[in-house]
Amino acid sequence: MSQFVLEIGTEELPARFLPALERELAERFTRALADAGIECDPVRVMSTPRRAVVRMDAVNPVQSESEEVVTGPPARIAFTPEGGLTKAAEGFARTQGVEVADIFRLTTDKGEYIAVRKHMGGARSIDLLRDICPAIIGALPFPKRMRWGSGDFTYARPMRWLLALFDESVVDFEVGGVRSGNITYGHRIHGAGPLTVARAGDYERVIREQGGVTPVGEERRNAVVKGGNALAVAAGGKVIWKDSLLDEVQGLVEHPVPCLGNIDPSFLELPREVLLTSMESHQKSFGVEDAEGRLMPHFLTVLNLTPLDGDLVRKGWERVLRARLEDARFFWKTDLASSFDAWLASLDNVIFLGPLGSMGDKTRRLEQLCAWLAAEVGFDDATAAARAGRLSKGDLVSGMVGEFDTLQGIMGGIYARRMGEAEAVAAAIAEQYLPAGPDSPVPSSMCGALLSIADKADTLAGCFGLGMIPTGAADPYALRRCVLGIARIILEHGLQLDVRGLFAKAFALYGERAWKLAPEDALVKLDEFFMARLRNLFIANGYETLLVEAVLAAGCDDVRSAGARLEALAAFSRRDDFASAVLTFKRAANIIRKQGGDSDVALDGAWKADLLVEDAERQLAASLEAMFPRFDGLWAEGDYPALFGLLGELRPVVDGFFEGVMVMSDDAALRTNRLNLLQALVGRLSRLADFGALQM
């Protein structure tokens, strides 16, 4: 077996491009090699800011061979009466690229035809790779592309060299004016090159030993963590590792060297969040804390070289960070000299969204919506909820958030505490933007949960009223995240809340607006949007799609109820008699669905005892009369597992009804009475789930 390596050398790529680039290269090469019939071990991909590398340590040097029988025209038109070949047969041979002598007769179920055997494959893998490599490189997707020089070729950053080796042979091709060869370049300081690679198998040794490059991202990450931990422990602390920043940092360096710097202890008067954000956002550095979780006057950064004078480099980093922290301290002191009243007045000059007014208008709506929500869910501190809504956006015009926009909400909570607001109000302001993503926690406080719901509902109502409905991947106002956030908060806090009523109230608080969609139409679309996202959330949480759809079809205005019903139905589905129960109740639901629309008499679920002539229908009526009070009591308690247990008890009686009674009797009175029996049953069933939507 042979070895292959491809290195795409560029100017520094953004760190965020590297994970997707590695995935694309692995998937595209794996697919292209399989399509070409080139057998190889799994494709390995690694990357640094200046290179993307594809390696295969065991590649078949020759394409797989196969034989294919190609059928031509029927023998009766391929041969003359004398046995010679007709023009049709000669044309077939010419089309297939074979000699006429290769034609033979083939008997099939449809008769006798002519055919040829074609031998496929057998090409040299290196020859096939000459076409595969440039095709893949040119098709790689990037968030942004650029041109350089005078050519039209585009890539994420200017391409400077291409190394492509199959064993010791160069895979010769050209992309964007750059021709492949056996030359690579190492770290700009520790092994710039050019470096010659004699064989594909030598590449990694050369780039590591001569080039001073650590080509594998996971190795760079581990080196940062190991070295950083050692430095922090020596200083009596531990590094505050942040995974997203760690991933970014390893993608910024080829030769990672952790470096521990110091900050003036006086800066520790700043809030922890401000210090960490200053370090992380501007300097790509990590904070250091002691065993009690208190910040220490140190930071950890990662260099892209081993410096000749480590102290000099460290002092340079300290000087730059000090300037950042001086700015942060200025904003902190300036903001503390201001007040929420001043900020709220300024919010009237900050636009929320076009026709939707100012951020000041939004805070006044949130004040009312939070108070309404508190009453709806039975929260006993409506005053705190309303106050949190009113102050929620004040920090947007503060100096600190103007400098560090990721601290919005967080700084509002900190300032609220410093300015004497109640703890519930401060906590709610700090938590208002949670959850920030699918894996982010929801607000921990009830006041924060209500403010977060109100904020998201207000945004959703306004955007849908303006026709700003997400389509495809486009969602500039993160409305999908808003919906998922509302659903998660309701589920995780166990709130009994009518979301349709929530959205209607949010629309009403806007008053008269120049809506693009009438509020009633926008509400319908918002309900559909919410149900679709709730469906996705339940499925992502591991529930079967059919069960989710059956529960949501029974109603999802009360998200807590929908979640509890789904959990109970999932448990019921694991019972041995589940399939039988579904078939029974599905039959009842389907009959009512069909006959309810066709019947001349409206079905209201009220049957007449004097029209119960069969034992089976009398037994069903008696069972329903006994069950309904139990059902209604359990429904009021929200005991859905017990409700599904009731259905299990009832199933044999319903089966007996279907076996012993002709529902669609010729007697109209009997038919209507029997349909009403089923309507009474289905009316209760449909509160739990739409059994007609289940498939067995």
UniProtKB/Swiss-Prot annotation:
Signal peptide: none annotated. The keyword Ligase applies. It is found in: Cytoplasm. One of its GO terms (biological process) is glycyl-tRNA aminoacylation. Transmembrane segments: none annotated. Keywords: Aminoacyl-tRNA synthetase, ATP-binding, Cytoplasm, Ligase, Nucleotide-binding, Protein biosynthesis. It catalyses: tRNA(Gly) + glycine + ATP = glycyl-tRNA(Gly) + AMP + diphosphate. The keyword Ligase applies. Its EC number is 6.1.1.14. PROSITE patterns: AA_TRNA_LIGASE_II_GLYAB. One of its GO terms (cellular component) is cytosol. It comes from the Bacteria. One of its GO terms (molecular function) is ATP binding. Belongs to the class-II aminoacyl-tRNA synthetase family. HAMAP family: Gly_tRNA_synth_beta. Tetramer of two alpha and two beta subunits. This is Glycine--tRNA ligase beta subunit. It comes from Nitratidesulfovibrio vulgaris (strain ATCC 29579 / DSM 644 / CCUG 34227 / NCIMB 8303 / VKM B-1760 / Hildenborough) (Desulfovibrio vulgaris). The lineage of its organism: Bacteria, Pseudomonadati, Thermodesulfobacteriota, Desulfovibrionia, Desulfovibrionales. The gene is glyS.
